[in-house]
């Protein structure tokens, strides 16, 4: 696997020198300063690429070229936003950048309720608490009909939890959910958030898939033409939330994508930390079935708790993800490609890491502190080395 590292640009507290010292050779980044929907110019792409290469690294993957909400709702100026997206892909290809990670999550990108969940060893992790999320949705957001998405027990627990929250607790929970986590291109006030949810009131799973199909049928032929590989990122968490449909959550969703536009440019990001939240997702089977279309991997683990919809981000080699079997399946896919004469490695990043050691004293992007990711990258690197030596050395 190609070892990569997500970098949020010149303002990232983790420098490119840090990235190189961590042992990564590739950078995963995006032009976050360009508004959603606008074309990424060749000039801006080359400017960022030069910064990365001057640090002795390569720009391996774009994560992400964000999709304008008008495309997802099939309203407003969506045709122009699609045309802009097509041009951005052409410009990236012209600059030699050919792997693009993206997602089709409506309104919210990835979300968590707790950004400083303290683990037994004193390090901090990200956590999604189903009951806290229910308390936010029913008692802070006050979304009409939200109760239908929860069990009677969860409704009672959420009311009890809300009753014990201070004003600061409520404000922090709201910020965590709607203000935008790293990589999310949109942040909202509560009123803005309600208005955006309202735009989806008539959009169910079938309709969102229909809108996604319009996007894919416009984008994938361009990607194919210019040699770009599109790698969709799964929903996080991988299930409907806030009354919003989610359509990249299961192996059935992956198959739907392939059936909708059967092109090798139409591929996947295997994010084990997102897909792995669901107990019914067999990660190894997903890799084996769709291996030729996996162009990027995020390798981290999560741990489901007593309420199976509550989870926290575990250490990379712990939790519910069998990292050994996952890495073995990815390495096997790389060797299959090599036998076909394809030498390209699959870019891998350790995704998130725990806030630990000296990073506990620093301001860091949630999930993206340096030391926790350094640890995760080293651990996954070791797993891969052992697998390569045990099964593929000649």
Curated annotation (Swiss-Prot):
Cofactor annotation comment: Mn(2+) can substitute for iron, but in higher concentrations. Cannot use Fe(3+), Ni(2+) or Mg(2+).
Outcome when changing residue 52 to V: In strain: MT78
Molecular functions per Gene Ontology: ferrous iron binding; manganese ion binding; mannonate dehydratase activity
Pathway the protein takes part in: Carbohydrate metabolism; pentose and glucuronate interconversion
Enzyme Commission number(s) from the entry: 4.2.1.8
N-terminal signal peptide: none
Mechanisms controlling activity: Is inhibited by high concentrations of Fe(2+) (> 2 mM), and by EDTA or other iron chelators in vitro.
Induction description: By fructuronate. Its expression is subjected to catabolite repression by glucose.
Activity-pH dependence: Optimum pH is about 7.5. The activity at pH 6.5 and 8.6 is only about 20% of the maximal achievable activity at optimum pH.
Cofactor: Fe(2+); Mn(2+)
Catalytic activity: D-mannonate = 2-dehydro-3-deoxy-D-gluconate + H2O
Keywords noted in UniProt: Iron, Lyase, Manganese
Pfam assignment, any one: UxuA
Gene3D superfamilies, sorted: Divalent-metal-dependent TIM barrel enzymes
GO annotation, biological process: D-glucuronate catabolic process; DNA damage response
Role summary: Catalyzes the dehydration of D-mannonate.
Similarity annotation: Belongs to the mannonate dehydratase family.
Name of this chain's protein: Mannonate dehydratase
Biological classification of the source: Bacteria, Pseudomonadati, Pseudomonadota, Gammaproteobacteria, Enterobacterales
Gene name as annotated: uxuA
């Amino acid at each position: 696997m190609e070892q990569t590292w997500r970098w949020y640009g010149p303002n990232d507290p983790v420098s490119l020198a840090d990235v190189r010292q961590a042992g990564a050779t590739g950078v995963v980044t995006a032009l976050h300063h360009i508004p959603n929907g606008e074309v990424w110019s060749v000039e801006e792409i080359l400017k960022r690429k030069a910064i990365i290469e001057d640090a002795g690294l390569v720009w391996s993957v774009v994560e992400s070229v964000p999709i304008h909400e008008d495309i997802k709702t099939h309203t407003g100026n969506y045709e122009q936003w699609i045309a802009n997206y097509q041009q951005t892909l052409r410009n990236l290809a012209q600059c030699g950048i050919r792997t693009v990670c993206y997602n089709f999550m409506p309104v919210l990108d990835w979300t968590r309720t707790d950004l400083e969940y303290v683990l037994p060893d004193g390090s901090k992790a990200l956590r999604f608490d189903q009951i806290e999320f229910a308390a936010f949705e029913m008692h802070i957001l006050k979304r009409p009909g939200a109760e239908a998405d929860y069990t009677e027990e969860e409704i009672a627990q959420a009311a009890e939890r809300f009753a014990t929250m201070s004003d600061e607790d409520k404000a922090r929970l709201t910020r965590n959910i709607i203000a935008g986590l790293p990589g999310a291109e949109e942040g909202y006030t509560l009123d803005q958030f309600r208005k955006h949810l309202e735009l989806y009131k008539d959009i169910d799973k079938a309709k969102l898939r229909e809108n996604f199909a319009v996007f894919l049928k416009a984008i994938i032929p361009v990607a194919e033409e210019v040699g770009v590989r599109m790698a969709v990122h799964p929903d996080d968490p991988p299930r409907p939330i806030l009354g919003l449909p989610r359509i990249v959550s299961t192996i059935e969703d992956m198959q739907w994508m392939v059936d909708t536009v059967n092109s090798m440019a139409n591929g996947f990001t295997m994010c084990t930390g997102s897909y792995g939240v669901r107990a019914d997702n067999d990660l190894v089977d997903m890799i084996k079935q769709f291996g030729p279309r996996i162009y990027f991997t995020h390798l981290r683990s999560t741990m489901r708790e007593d309420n199976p919809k509550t989870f926290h981000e575990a250490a990379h080699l712990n939790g519910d993800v069998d990292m050994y079997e996952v890495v073995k399946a990815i390495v096997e896919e790389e060797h299959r490609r090599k036998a076909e004469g394809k030498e390209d490695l699959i870019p891998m990043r350790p995704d998130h890491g725990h806030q630990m050691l000296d990073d506990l004293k620093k301001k860091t992007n949630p999930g993206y502190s340096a030391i926790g990711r350094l640890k995760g990258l080293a651990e996954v690197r070791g797993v891969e080395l052992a697998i390569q030596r045990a099964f593929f050395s000649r």
